[in-house]
Curated annotation (Swiss-Prot):
Residues that span the membrane, as ranges: 1-21
Localization, UniProt: Membrane
Function per UniProt: The phosphoenolpyruvate-dependent sugar phosphotransferase system (PTS), a major carbohydrate active -transport system, catalyzes the phosphorylation of incoming sugar substrates concomitant with their translocation across the cell membrane.
Domain notes for this protein: The EIIB domain is phosphorylated by phospho-EIIA on a cysteinyl or histidyl residue, depending on the transported sugar. Then, it transfers the phosphoryl group to the sugar substrate concomitantly with the sugar uptake processed by the EIIC domain.
Keyword Ion transport set for record: no
UniProt GO MF annotations: protein-N(PI)-phosphohistidine-sugar phosphotransferase activity
Membrane topology: Single-pass membrane protein
Name of the protein in question: Putative phosphotransferase enzyme IIB component MPN_268
Amino acid sequence: MKVLLWIGYVLSFGLLYLYLVKRAKRAALQLNNKLVESHTIPFAVRDFIAACGGRTNFVSLRTSPTQLIVSFAKPELVQIAALQKLGIKGINKSQNQYRFVLGNFVNQLKQQIENER
């Protein structure tokens, strides 16, 4: 009797295991063609502009997928500490140009800065 019970356990759990493996493989092979892009900016755009020295300090704006590349008329007006308080992930300076590592909402930020100018 115990032997039949053990055979029943092995068969039932074996079939359950095979079913779960097949289901996991099917889920792993599904293609994900959706690109997730955030449309919410986690800080006030006016605070960002103020920390960059005001609207008139912006010369040009460009974006990469996660970075905002800005050329300033007077780079000495940029307040690094104020920008870091806004939660900017990285700030790289090269001559009059700054690269702000922000995230995938950089296109929305660029549009709002251009609308404010």
